[in-house]
Amino acid sequence: MLAFQQRGTIIAGVSFDIPGMGYKNPRTGLIEGFEADLARAIAEKLLGAPDRIDFYQITDEKRIPALQSDLVDMVLSQLTITPDRAEQVDFSIPYYITREGLLVPKGSDIKGLDDLKGKRIAVTEGSISLRRMRASLPSLPGATLVITPLSFGNLEAVANGEADAASNDMINLTMMHRASDHPERYEIIDIGDRFDKKPFGVAVKKGNHPFVDLLNRAVEALKGAGEIDRLFNKNLEAAGSRSA
């Protein structure tokens, strides 16, 4: 029997700062968002009830260490499946595939990756976007990175004039844009044609193959039933209503 089965609850590491993805509602204290709802749906599949879940706040750079130190059973926090990460943790099949994007002020002269020359780019510590932007710097003379601990800090850096653009997953940027106080002030640019796609997987501690098998079956069933699409669309709409 796996640890979460003995305990009767799954401890899930999720973001608490991204409306629509993983977000702690300051009014209710509830953890909301697409990945939080997906974690509940997985708990229902594996333990019989969606409330058999405990949420643990995770930041990008702490996602893998939290699994390695047994702070959490699984991570659903926009963790892109990459070969080097797969050497450190095990992944389920992808539950969502996104692309690289930029968020810029409305009317910005930034229309694509090459326009970031001489610009300040906000990225999240521990993210694939940080890796990609750092690797792109030699071809972007004068560009600098503004590194934030949380993804929502990307948007805040642009809003406060501390960055000219934010680089993040298209799904994160879309959710944050829709949930912002003034979505009309920003626009999102898809630069996914310049980079590999970003498949998100549920991550677990390395070597926990029985848990991966259970997660794969759960994700496959939720996909097949259209539940993952439903949860995504529900939270996309809810993120937009926050700024209405």
Residue ranges and their predicted role:
Residues 1-75:
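Extracytoplasmic small-molecule ligand-binding "clamshell" domains
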Residues 96-104, 178-220, 236-244:
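Periplasmic-binding protein-like
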Residues 16-17, 29, 80-81, 105-109, ...:
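Short coil/turn segments
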Residues 62, 78-87, 132-137, 159-160, ...:
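A ligand-binding cleft/hinge motif common to bilobed small-molecule-binding domains
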Residues 40, 44, 52-115, 192:
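Acidic, polar ligand-binding/catalytic clefts
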Residues 128-146, 184-187, 219-244:
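Ligand-binding clefts/hinges and TM-proximal coupling segments of bilobed small-molecule sensing domains
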Residues 1, 37, 41-46, 114, ...:
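Extended ligand-binding regions for polar small-molecule ligands
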Residues 25-28, 40-51, 129-148, 177-183:
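Ligand-binding cleft/hinge of the Venus flytrap
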